[in-house]
């Protein structure tokens, strides 16, 4: 299913594009499909801007030409995944702890295409998947306490392959936050959390996604569809 979604996303890519390369399992499949198109000559003069060290390493291994985010005035198209998508195309991202670079790339993109499976579609954000908040190591407890006053329950994300917490590409830590009633006003909450001293960025992507491509299984057959934005 993820491969079908990834392959379909590549159909949006045109020769000469500067392309934002997303992170995560579906994005990795997209990067591999992109590399094959470039290798076969079906796509030419593509330059990629990776959203994480993970996607950068994969792109380099597959010989996709890369360009630094700071050196481009805009990105033609960014293709990325999401952890949750609501009917207004507001997103939670950051399950891979790289939402800071993902948001930088998304905000510079002329178009942001989100590729997901049907399980990521939700009516209200944050009722299941926690909101990642990247914090300075010295500030995590202070930020946790402030978020608690906002009715949010925070847990420091712990690593699975090493002792201690997850450390981001920027050298920071991640608080995973669940709010009592979920997130009803993503725009307001994004601003309030980012205004907390010690917070670098949170995983709410508000008014950034232009199109969502969804894969699902229907009668044992993989099906693609693109929902309409509610608002």
From Swiss-Prot:
Gene3D superfamilies: 3.30.70.260, 3.40.50.1360. Substrate binds at residues 23-26, 80-83, 93-96, 120. InterPro entries: NagB/RpiA_transferase-like, Ribose5P_isomerase_typA_subgr, Ribose5P_isomerase_type_A. It catalyses: aldehydo-D-ribose 5-phosphate = D-ribulose 5-phosphate. Pfam families: Rib_5-P_isom_A. The active site is at residue 102. It is an enzyme of class 5 (isomerase). Pathway: Carbohydrate degradation; pentose phosphate pathway; D-ribose 5-phosphate from D-ribulose 5-phosphate (non-oxidative stage): step 1/1. GO terms for biological process: D-ribose metabolic process; pentose-phosphate shunt, non-oxidative branch. Its EC number is 5.3.1.6. One of its GO terms (molecular function) is ribose-5-phosphate isomerase activity. Keywords: Isomerase. One of its GO terms (cellular component) is cytosol. The keyword DNA repair does not apply. CDD domains: RPI_A (cd01398). Belongs to the ribose 5-phosphate isomerase family. Catalyzes the reversible conversion of ribose-5-phosphate to ribulose 5-phosphate. NCBIfam families: PRK00702.1, rpiA. HAMAP family: Rib_5P_isom_A (MF_00170). Homodimer. This is Ribose-5-phosphate isomerase A. It comes from Prochlorococcus marinus subsp. pastoris (strain CCMP1986 / NIES-2087 / MED4).
């Amino acid at each position: 299913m993820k491969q079908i979604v990834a392959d379909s996303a590549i159909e949006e890519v045109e020769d000469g594009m500067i392309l934002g390369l997303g992170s995560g399992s579906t994005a990795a499949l997209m990067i591999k499909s992109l590399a094959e198109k470039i290798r076969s000559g079906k796509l030419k003069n593509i330059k990629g801007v990776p959203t994480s060290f993970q996607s950068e390493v994969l792109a380099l291994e597959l010989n996709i030409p890369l360009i630094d985010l700071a050196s481009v005035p805009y990105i033609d198209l960014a293709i990325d995944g999401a952890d949750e998508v609501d009917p207004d195309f507001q997103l939670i991202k950051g399950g891979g702890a790289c939402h800071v670079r993902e948001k930088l790339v998304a905000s510079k993109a002329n178009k942001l295409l989100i590729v997901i499976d049907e399980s990521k579609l939700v009516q209200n954000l944050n009722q299941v998947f926690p909101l990642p908040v990247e914090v300075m190591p010295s500030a995590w407890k202070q930020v946790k306490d402030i978020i608690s006053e906002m009715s949010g329950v925070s847990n420091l994300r712990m690593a699975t392959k090493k002792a201690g917490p997850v450390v981001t590409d920027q050298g920071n830590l991640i608080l995973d936050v669940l709010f009592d009633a979920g997130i009803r006003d993503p725009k307001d909450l994004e601003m309030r959390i980012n205004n907390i001293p010690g917070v670098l960025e949170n995983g709410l992507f508000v008014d950034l996604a232009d199109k969502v491509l969804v894969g699902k299984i229907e009668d044992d057959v993989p099906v693609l569809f693109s929902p309409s934005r509610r608002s």
